[in-house]
Amino acid sequence: MPAEARDRSALAQKSFERLAEVCGDITAPVLEAYYREHPGARQSFVDHGLGETAKLEGRMVAESLFLLLTWTENQSAARIDHGSAIVHHNDTMRIPPHWYLGMVDAVLEVLLGTLPAEADDERDMWREVRSEFARFVQSLREEFVRSDGGAPLPAFPVAKM
């Protein structure tokens, strides 16, 4: 693993350990943040959850955490894992890229809320990861069979960083 990836991985581990210590299970606060920004996504979880909405929601929160960790350790692997998933979610399940990115943003909002003021290195790394992932999501939009409407993907609110 290149030195930069090791550094990012170490910062991510530090952030995730603190997140677990401070929050424990982050599912509820992540979903609160997610549905606040994407209220229309709630019905999609009900529809796709097939009676197991809470289980699906929990799995998507965990998937977003794992995506962020993987992105810091091996961006190529994360791109392979999520490249087809993002297109599939849009084209087959009608889950637009705003919602996909929104779940990652909700996880980051909760995670960033646990960082101490002096953790600029972690904060900067997560800003960079979010920016990289948003560019990746944007790059996949040209592969969509079903248009998502083309509205720009949102920037991560500075106030939440």
Locate predicted features.
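Globin-like tetrapyrrole-binding proteins
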Residues: 1-161
